[in-house]
């Protein structure tokens, strides 16, 4: 359910691309420093966006350094270090990845996910005193989501997606006590709903073939159509829902006093979401794509 929130590279200035990579690599290094080597494999672009957005709400000066890493052992990469927003994003990166593994185990008894979750569990408690209340919020929201998915009958896609949307709204608005917290919440809420729905559409064929829960199939496929037939009937509906969510994200973003990185953030919310949506709706395989 992660990795959909990325810049549109075609519309990105070179300096903005380098800044995005510096946050991404900084997040990777922070995960290693705060949680260990293993959790670094969970890094995703969505949490990079979170770090950039939250760091852009304050006029603090970033510290840039050049370091080697396991992926790029020869050439040093520019990273942002000692950054409060990145530390916050690192925690949620690890925590959400852990609960995603638990969901995989619950869904299909995945042995791989079961083993990985046991290894990852000890890491999410490394900063438990600092982030204890956030762990409870993640746990409660995702448990509510799983209950709603199991009892999907007579529920709308809005009702089911609410739990994940509320969680992402909580994550964005709970960083600090800004006077524009409400806009942060609704930006996060609509982004979470967008992620939940686009992920469901991306996985629709696989989930239908494996007879797994998929909110789009379970809510809308009343006539039990096969994938090809059903996709043709539902595509415009999903397009409409995703465009509305993306529009609400941008509207709330425009109400927030962004101090820096505005061009990069605007690129992600204006062009990146629409590009990703277009590719997923066309059936492009995004699994191995990277920036």
What do these predicted ranges mean?
Residues 1-166, 170-186, 197-243, 251-264, ...:
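Acidic catalytic motifs of isoprenoid enzymes
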């Amino acid at each position: 359910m992660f990795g959909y929130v990325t810049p549109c590279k075609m519309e990105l200035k070179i300096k903005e691309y380098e800044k995005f990579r510096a946050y991404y690599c900084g997040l990777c290094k922070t995960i290693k420093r705060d949680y260990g080597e293993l959790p670094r494999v969970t890094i995703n672009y969505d949490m990079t966006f979170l770090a950039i957005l939250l760091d852009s709400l304050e006029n603090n000066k970033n510290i840039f350094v050049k370091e080697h890493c396991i992926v790029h052992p020869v050439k040093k990469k520019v990273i942002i270090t000692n950054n409060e927003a990145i530390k916050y994003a690192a925690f949620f990166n690890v925590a959400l990845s852990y609960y995603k593994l638990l969901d995989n185990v619950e869904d299909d008894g995945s042995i791989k996910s079961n083993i990985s979750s046991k290894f990852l569990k000890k890491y999410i408690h490394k900063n438990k005193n600092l982030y204890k209340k956030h762990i409870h919020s993640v746990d409660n929201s995702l448990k509510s989501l799983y209950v709603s998915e199991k009892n999907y009958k007579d529920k709308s896609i809005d009702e089911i997606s609410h739990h994940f949307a509320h969680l992402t709204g909580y994550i964005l608005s709970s960083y600090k006590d800004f006077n524009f917290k409400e806009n942060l919440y609704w930006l996060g809420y609509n982004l979470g709903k967008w992620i939940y729905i686009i992920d469901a559409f991306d996985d629709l064929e696989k989930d239908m073939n494996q007879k797994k829960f998929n909110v789009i199939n379970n809510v809308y496929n009343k006539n039990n159509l096969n994938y090809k037939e059903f996709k043709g009937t539902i595509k415009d509906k999903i397009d409409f829902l995703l465009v509305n969510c993306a529009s609400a994200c941008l509207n709330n973003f425009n109400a927030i006093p962004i101090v820096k990185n505005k061009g990069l953030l605007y690129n992600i919310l204006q062009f990146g979401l629409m590009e990703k949506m277009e590719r997923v709706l066309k059936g492009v395989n995004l699994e191995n794509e990277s920036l």
